[in-house]
Amino acid sequence: MGYLLLEGGAEFGGRMSEPDLRAMELAGGFEAQIAILPTAAAPDHNHKRAGNNGIRWFQSLGAKHVFSVDVIDAQSANDPKLADQLRNAKIIYLLGGFPRYLGETLKGSACWSAAMEAYAKGAILAGSSAGAMVLCEHYYDPYERKLLAGLSLVPNACVLP
């Protein structure tokens, strides 16, 4: 079983360098494969920018193998090629954005199953803002103003970054 890393917002603004460096160390160092999941940024068409921000951030910390996995809807969440990228990653980082969209897109998908396989083999699952929220048993959707069922990696918890 791997580690979970739950971070607040502004994930690539410089304040998360210490926990991100520690995650890289636990994942095998600067050579670890780091997969950025910009799913939560897809509804407002910011997933490319968000994914690129994640790539630049981890490269600035010294990571050599960082890539964005464009899981942006139900179809791509079930793409076997994208699932393989997640299955082989040592860090899978869920970005912030729209929590409900992220949770509903990943839940029950091939990509989420692949992420869980990687986690079972020791990969780190990290989430910032919406990404941290959906990893819990419950999360609050600020747009719908209600509590929803999360991906349940953190039981009996609800993170509100």
What are these regions (language model features)?
Residues L95, Y101-P161:
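Class I SAM-dependent methyltransferase SAM-binding "motif I" and its flanking Rossmann-like core
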Residues M1-I91, L95:
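N-terminal beta1-alpha1 cap of cysteine-dependent amidohydrolase-like domains
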